[in-house]
Regions:
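A glycine-anchored, Pro-Gly-centered beta-turn/N-cap motif
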Residues: 481-485, 497-500
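Sec-dependent signal peptide recognition
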Residues: 2-11
């Protein structure tokens, strides 16, 4: 049963324009987690998977409002550096380092697969085994045109060795059968690095797929940031790596209060149907402006990586502040570039916030905004991991980061609806509507759902379960004039079992969601 109450539009515009809070959601805080990865299923954006060191996995069926979790196990052992991706069949893949009882520490890269949304995982397959050489820092991408999976990582002859006879290289492997068999690892870098896990080590290889199946990847090392590509699915690569840019001060640097920090690069390619389709982007951080002024940077290429732009700064604060642990993604529906990073622009000590930035014009300009609902102090004796992460599709954006709270690490995300990012105070730029949290929440019987309409719009309001199955259509394609409206929803009439549900407000290309709990 539903009903409607109309309230006149008084002071709503002011409240709308002042909107700036992004709900923070705790993903998990068991096992001292850090170094998170997250992925939104582009085919079902309410389905998300995440992971963190050393063996944690998380999955959500309601757009990241709530999470289930567990620890992953494998006969190959699990030793962190997680990366998660999803293919077009809905299979989830979890890549990590190994620690087998029958081999050597991190002697291969492991891929474990889930076919039930992350509830259970296979024992896994592996790639890169090469005696006792160490295989480290994997990252993966799925070519969604054919579900081929690509992985890049760093191989150390002997991790931590200072011997000039030991070196580090970038390796590549692929699977064409949904992760069952992996190709023989292939070296794709020409200039080797050392094994000290520092500025002169080659690390940070994040592969991406281009509009026509190209594979692009960059990494950092003794030459700065360099780039390679394959035009035949990884069979062959360029004989000469392309120099992209210097990293003044190196990729391995110090941030006060952080156990270990780096500015390793992240590579992305725009394969949307937007105006910047085919653009390549590389994002990193460095201390070219001094050790007290770490900044986030971006370069781009419009010719498949042949030439690169000069670096542009992503963070828009005055000099003298720290921005670090950046990650980037491209929304392959809109072509928008999204960044997440830690930020101290509002503080003079170690107090830390989490910021995001977005570029809607192909990396020419950036808007920065804070997403953490409170600041935190890190502890230099607590390992924070080596990266944050972010995923986006069709204006649904989910960053993920590590936070220290009362001595305990936790993994957090934020509900970032891109329609709320960059609200202008010019009336012609305001958005058509907003959706408020239901009340009461949790719900025992009846709850009220309110929304505000700023421009006359045609509205649909529905309630779904966490699997995306429709429970009720409360408003079906009805036109509303400017104002505030309240719909009431009778949960008992629909015989809902206790648990999480969500409601969705849609008008044209604008889609808003919120979660509610039925007791």
């Amino acid at each position: 049963m539903t009903g409607k109450i109309f309230l006149t539009l008084i002071s709503l515009l002011y409240g709308y324009l002042c909107f700036g809070q992004y709900p923070n959601v705790l993903v998990g805080n068991t096992g001292y987690p850090e170094e998170p990865s997250i992925f939104i299923n582009p085919d079902h954006t309410n389905q998300m998977v995440a992971a963190s060191n050393i063996d944690n996995y998380y999955y959500s069926g309601d757009g990241g409002y709530s999470w289930q979790s567990g620890t992953i196990t494998s006969s190959y052992g699990v030793w962190g550096d997680p990366c998660v991706v999803i293919d077009t069949a809905g299979n989830l893949y979890y890549f990590h380092l190994s620690n087998p009882s029958f081999g050597s520490w991190i002697d291969r890269i492991v891929c474990q697969k889930s076919i039930d949304g992350g509830q259970t995982w296979s024992d896994g397959t592996s790639m890169g085994l090469n005696g006792i050489k160490a295989q480290d820092k994997p990252w993966s991408i799925v070519d969604r045109s054919n579900n081929t999976i690509y992985v890049c990582w760093t191989q150390f002859d002997r991790y931590g060795s200072s011997s000039p006879n030991d070196s580090s290289v970038i390796l590549f492997s692929r699977s064409t059968d949904n992760g069952q068999i992996w190709s023989l690892a292939k070296r794709i870098n020409r200039q080797a690095g050392d094994c000290l896990d520092g500025d002169n080590t080659v690390e940070g290889a994040v592969p991406v797929v281009g509009p026509n199946g190209e594979i692009y990847v960059s990494w950092a090392g003794p030459l700065g940031i360099v780039f390679n590509k394959s035009l035949d699915g990884g069979e062959t690569w360029m004989d000469t790596n392309i120099f992209v840019t210097d990293i003044p001060g190196g990729w391995d640097f110090q941030i006060p209060g952080i156990y270990r920090a780096n500015g390793l690069p992240v590579t992305c390619c725009d394969i949307s149907d937007g105006p910047y389709r085919g653009n390549l982007y590389i994002n990193w951080s460095d201390q070219r402006n001094g050790p007290t002024d770490t900044d986030v940077w971006l370069v781009k290429s419009t010719n498949q990586g042949t030439t690169w732009s000069s670096p542009v700064k992503v963070n828009d604060d005055p000099p003298g502040h720290q921005q670090f642990f950046t990650w980037m993604t491209v929304d392959q529906k809109t072509g928008f570039i999204w960044f997440v990073f830690y930020d101290r622009r509002e503080h003079s000590d170690w107090l830390t916030d989490v910021y995001m930035a977005v570029s809607r014009d192909g990396g020419e300009t950036f808007q920065n905004f804070k997403i953490s609902d409170s600041s935190f102090y890190p502890n230099p004796s607590v390992f924070f991991g080596d990266y944050t992460n972010i995923s986006a599709f069709n204006n649904i954006v989910r960053p993920i980061w590590t936070r220290l709270n009362n001595g305990y690490l936790g993994i957090w995300t934020a509900i970032v609806d891109s329609m709320f990012v960059g609200i202008s105070k010019d009336l012609e730029n305001i958005l058509p509507l907003s959706l408020e949290q239901n009340w009461p929440n949790p719900v025992k019987n009846v709850t009220y759902i309110s929304f505000k309409v700023y421009v006359s719009s045609t509205i649909t309001l529905r309630v779904f379960d966490i699997f995306g199955r429709e429970i009720s259509t409360m408003v079906d394609n009805q036109k509303f004039n400017a104002g505030k409206y309240i719909e009431y929803f009778d949960a008992s009439a629909h015989h809902l079992v206790p648990g999480f549900y969500y409601f969705s407000l849609v008008s044209g290309e604008t889609s808003l969601q919120r979660k509610m709990l039925v007791e």
